[in-house]
Regions:
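A short alpha-helical cap/connector motif
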Residues: 1-177
């Protein structure tokens, strides 16, 4: 697992992991570009260099419209619930990026449960070498030091629980079984 140090380092590391001798890649993203991260645009740029396609899904029509205008025809942005789209996908996934349900670090369970549902709907399409990234899933309390300076994060750091620490916590537990 990678600690969420910064977006540039994280994305660069992930793209190096999946850049191999492949003709085409298939990326699936839940939660399109939001809050300035521009992940969908990054995946689209990768696909335009190395070939393939991107499926991104979001419930917010405004986010979908803005994102669709910024990507190529190799990226399809769906305006629907990810739990409805994922069962319709029938090809192997090279890169899965789960980021559809904003996490409340004081109550991460609803987001974690949603991402576990997403993962379970698509895990049969993952193969050895597939990359799964779940945003906002700190691996250690030091993650909270990375620019998150506020009284609420100081409280979180004191009560940090690696078994319930963000969107991907339940997926992590599932993978450890």
């Amino acid at each position: 697992f990678y600690t969420h140090i910064n977006y540039h380092t994280m994305y660069k590391s992930l793209l190096e992991l999946i850049k191999n001798e492949k003709d085409k890649y298939f990326f699936v993203e839940t939660g399109c570009s939001a809050h300035g991260t521009k992940s969908t645009i990054l995946w689209d740029k990768f696909i335009n260099i190395f070939d393939g396609k991107v499926y991104s899904v979001d419930l917010n029509p405004n986010a979908v419209n803005i994102t669709q205008k910024q990507v190529s025809k190799k990226t399809t942005v769906f305006c629907m619930n990810s739990l409805e789209l994922l069962p319709q996908i029938d090809e192997q996934v090279d890169f899965l990026y789960l980021d559809s349900y904003d996490v409340d670090f004081l109550n991460p369970k609803p987001s974690a449960e949603h991402h576990l549902k997403e993962f379970n709907l698509i895990k049969h399409l993952l193969k050895p070498g597939s990359v799964v990234l779940i945003d906002d899933t700190p691996c250690s309390p030091e993650w909270l030091d990375g620019g998150m300076k506020s009284p609420i994060y100081e409280k979180l750091k004191k009560q940090f629980d690696p078994n319930m620490c963000g969107k991907g916590s339940l997926v992590n537990l599932e993978l450890e079984k």
